[in-house]
Regions:
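Acidic/polar, glycine-enriched structural segments that form the non-catalytic walls/loops
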Residues: 1-47, 142-156, 163, 221-234
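Aromatic-lined, polymer-binding surfaces characteristic
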Residues: 8-12, 16-19, 24, 30-37, ...
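Secondary-structure transition/capping residues
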Residues: 37, 68-69, 87, 131, ...
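Aromatic-rich carbohydrate-recognition surfaces in CAZymes
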Residues: 61-69, 73-180, 206-214
Length: 235
């Protein structure tokens, strides 16, 4: 019955039976069972949470499984560092201590948080999620010669709202600045992990990342306006 509730809200009818069969129940089932619960696939069987990965996944669940989507948004907020960057991935350990994970210079990860939260507000409005307090992670920032670090960070005593977590993520991307062509610096990734060394020295730029950041800023401006944050909305 639980599975029926999760996968039954969406149904399509097209002239293609195979497409109907997949979209009606199986697509949502696969998203929840494989991507969110098992976190495994033919190409990646590590079982870790990916910051960007599972935020993208729950984007498909906001309307149909809001409890699961909300839990993942809060989980990702809790894996953001005080400086605004995030753990690219981490392994759940079932303890009260922060999990081991990798801190990187990948830039697009950060932006999936405000993007997904903006999608949430389109469906559920200002329902209280943005005001939820969540703590940060704390560890030494990456040194100039560090591209990434696998570590167990500390849990920060600082709690801020989901709204502030999203703001910190965008401010972090803004602080990384643009390159000589006026495009966002990609750091060690812009969604395409195979390009992780292109921006490693600090000068690599990304057209895709610039497009995505522009989209996120546009959407977040609308969220800020609805929240009464006029300064952020106008910025």
């Amino acid at each position: 019955q639980w599975w029926h509730i999760q996968v039954s809200p969406m149904e399509i009818q097209t002239p293609e039976p195979a497409l109907n069969h997949y979209i009606n129940r199986w697509a949502l089932y696969q998203t929840i069972a494989c991507r969110l619960f098992a976190r495994a696939g033919l190409y990646q069987c590590g079982g870790g949470y990916g910051f960007r990965d599972q935020l993208q996944d729950v984007g498909a669940l906001i309307s149909t499984s809001p409890v699961l989507a909300r839990e993942q948004i809060l989980r990702c907020c809790a894996h953001q560092f005080e400086e605004g960057d995030v753990q690219h991935w981490w392994h759940p350990e079932g303890t009260d201590r922060p999990e081991r994970g990798v801190r990187t210079r990948i830039t697009d990860d950060l932006l999936w948080l405000p993007y997904t939260v903006s999608c949430w507000t389109e469906v559920w409005g200002l329902d209280g999620l943005l005001e939820e307090p969540v703590s940060y992670l704390r560890s030494p920032v990456l040194a100039k010669d560090e591209l990434e670090r696998y570590e167990r960070p500390e849990r920060s005593e600082r709690f801020e709202s989901v709204y502030q977590h999203c703001t910190r993520a965008m401010e972090c991307v803004l602080a990384r600045g643009v390159g000589e062509h006026g495009l966002c610096r990609m750091g060690t990734g812009d969604w395409n992990d195979g390009m992780n060394h292109i921006g490693a020295q600090g000068w690599g730029e990304s057209v895709w990342l610039t497009w995505f950041f522009g989209l996120v800023l546009e959407r977040w401006g609308a969220v800020a306006g609805r929240c009464g944050d006029r300064e952020a909305a106008e910025r």
